Amino acid sequence: VSIEMALCAGKGHACAIGRKESALTPLGENCRKFRVTNLTVVPGTAPEACADLPAPTHAFLGGSSGNMQEIIALLLRKNPNVRIVATAIALESIAELTACMKRFAFAQTEVVSISVARNRKAGPYNPMTGQNPIYIFTMQGGHLG
């Protein structure tokens, strides 16, 4: 997602925060592979790792290590009109994001659920087996009050 965000940013800049070295190494390799020069990779855990980053216009949250409300509060302090997109598959994450939508009273919200199914061989048939649905939350124009 970070590479795609940087590519879409054009002359803008993207930042990726990651706490796992196993994710950061391939990210650096993909920056070189796709000639992405407008992506800063920051090792660490949010919100602490993003404290010194500039105010974002957009933010993608692919995980929060249990810090979702703190991360969103920091993003809103930096830019009250930041557009936040967050994904969730666990019920706890879905509940936390729903609570954030209420707590920060966003002016614009949308939740989309995407379901995926894969075929599997079962004798002469190929039934489709459902995978975990993915919930995509989009929020903008929140308030810290």
Model regions: which residues?
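S-adenosyl-L-methionine
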Residues: 15-56
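Cytosolic regulatory regions of ion transport systems
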Residues: 38, 67-68, 91
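Active-site-adjacent beta-strand anchor residues
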Residues: 17, 61, 87-88
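Short beta-strand element of Class I
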Residues: 11-16, 84
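Short SAM/SAH-binding signature in class I
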Residues: 54-63, 83
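Core SAM-dependent methyltransferase catalytic element
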Residues: 123-145
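C-terminal substrate-binding/active-site "lid" region of AdoMet-derived donor-dependent transferases
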Residues: 73-130
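Conserved SAM-binding loop of SAM-dependent methyltransferases across substrates and taxa
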Residues: 1-11
